[in-house]
């Protein structure tokens, strides 16, 4: 079997689409395909860019051209879908990537109650987040604010190690205010958004209200999250092979 055929098979078995991270973890498991290269993950990345067979849906997510009209709405929304719903699908997708990254990195992952039933590539977010209820790590009013954050990674001491807000079009101020509530904890704060919002991010963060956290908040683009997801998955695949 040729390498591109192995990628096609994995996608077909997954419904005609897959994240690059999913491909990294599964393509090399196909026994009758030989990868005579020291950089198989780079080869997979190159293969999915072959527009004879594949097309890109969003950062980190690819599909088979043969399945274009068969994909679920949350994977590839039709142009007739309301803009709000398309934005919700995109928002949930990046939440899902962050949850999966956290899971691989051995964190406890949490998503808010209002998002648990949203679909991430055919699965509810609640099905991939590792904890259902937020840890009571502080006073009630602090936890109440934290439980609305898009994704939280909790460490082994049940404390919030990293918190993420995915922002497509809403005001970044709301997310930064949530981070302010957690300023007394040793947490990393991350805003995930389109690169076009970088200037807006820095403008908001420069306000006096956010001075206490200004050096702790970082901006991640959608592309950076997708890249982290694929590389984290590739590392996990190597570790599994070596039985680490």
List the predicted regions and their residue ranges.
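Charged low-complexity interaction tracts in eukaryotic proteins
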Residues: 1-4, 21, 30-79
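Long, charge-rich, low-complexity intrinsically disordered regions
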Residues: 94-100, 104
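Catalytic cores of nucleic-acid endonucleases
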Residues: 129, 135-149, 154-223
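Hydrophobic residues on short alpha-helical segments
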Residues: 4-11
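C-terminal helix of von Willebrand factor
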Residues: 216-244
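Short capping segments at the starts of secondary-structure elements
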Residues: 12-19
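Active-site metal-binding core of divalent-cation-utilizing nuclease and nuclease-like domains
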Residues: 81-87, 103, 111-158, 231-240
């Amino acid at each position: 079997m040729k390498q591109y055929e192995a990628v096609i098979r994995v996608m077909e078995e997954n419904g005609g689409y897959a994240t690059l991270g999913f491909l990294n973890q599964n393509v090399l498991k196909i026994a009758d395909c030989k990868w005579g290269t020291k950089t198989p993950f780079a080869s997979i990345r190159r293969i999915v860019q072959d527009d004879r067979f594949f097309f890109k849906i969003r950062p980190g997510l690819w599909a088979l051209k043969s399945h274009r009209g068969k994909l679920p709405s949350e994977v590839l929304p039709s142009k007739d879908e309301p803009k709000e719903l398309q934005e919700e699908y995109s928002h949930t997708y990046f939440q899902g990537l962050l949850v999966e990254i956290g899971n691989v990195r051995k964190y406890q992952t949490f998503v808010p109650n209002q998002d648990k039933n949203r679909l991430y590539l055919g699965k509810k977010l609640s099905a991939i987040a590792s904890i259902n209820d937020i840890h009571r790590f502080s006073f009630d009013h602090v936890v109440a604010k934290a439980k609305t954050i898009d994704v939280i990674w909790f460490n082994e001491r049940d404390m919030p190690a990293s918190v993420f807000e995915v922002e497509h079009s809403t005001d970044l101020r709301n997310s930064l205010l949530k981070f302010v509530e957690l300023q007394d904890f040793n947490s990393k704060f991350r805003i995930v958004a389109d690169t076009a919002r970088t200037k807006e991010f820095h403008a908001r963060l420069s306000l006096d209200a956010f001075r206490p956290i200004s050096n702790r908040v970082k901006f991640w683009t959608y592309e950076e999250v997708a890249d982290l997801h694929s590389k984290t998955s590739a590392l996990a695949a190597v570790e599994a092979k070596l039985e680490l």
